[in-house]
């Protein structure tokens, strides 16, 4: 059963390889999500054209918060370039991307890997451990969750709950 779950997780992750999630962009009536992604690309110095985007839409959420945008790129290379440049958004205001948004809106824009549900759960648990000061760093690369317990150079890949449990001991 465990192998079946692992195979399902790997297959789901493979289907999300070209995807990123963009959080923090408020919904506007008549919005053009492809244009928003292109503007974000300009802001982070990544040349994105409409031909680079396979599909872009908002995800449904159970809570009434701003729905994230999911982008599927046509090439893995463009997805990686966009994802790796995400740190350039740290000082960007939403009004710099969407002119119709008031300047008072100070929320940040985040770009994340689009993770399979199981890996998203592992990421949430790892982040809780980081907040509890049990881990120094938590991040994802290509849908895989990595952590550092100390500042040592070698990260630990987290595939299952017991990987995190072993780090806690």
Language model features with spans:
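C-terminal folded interaction/catalytic domains of modular proteins
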Residues: 1-169
């Amino acid at each position: 059963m465990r192998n079946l779950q692992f195979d399902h997780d790997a297959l789901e992750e493979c289907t999300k390889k070209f995807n990123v999630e963009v959080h923090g962009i408020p919904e506007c009536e008549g919005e053009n999500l492809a244009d928003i992604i292109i503007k974000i690309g300009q802001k982070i110095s990544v040349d994105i054209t409409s031909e680079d985007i396979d599909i872009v839409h908002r995800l449904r959420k159970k809570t009434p918060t701003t729905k994230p945008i999911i982008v599927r790129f046509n090439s893995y290379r463009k997805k990686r370039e966009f994802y790796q440049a995400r740190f350039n958004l740290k000082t960007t205001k939403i009004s710099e991307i969407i002119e119709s948004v008031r300047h008072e809106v100070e929320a940040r824009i985040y770009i994340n890997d689009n993770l399979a549900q199981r890996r998203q759960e592992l990421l949430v648990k790892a982040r809780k451990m980081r907040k509890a000061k049990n881990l120094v760093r938590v991040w994802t690369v290509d849908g895989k969750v990595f952590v550092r317990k100390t500042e040592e150079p070698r990260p630990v890949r987290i595939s299952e709950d017991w990987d995190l449990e072993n780090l806690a001991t």
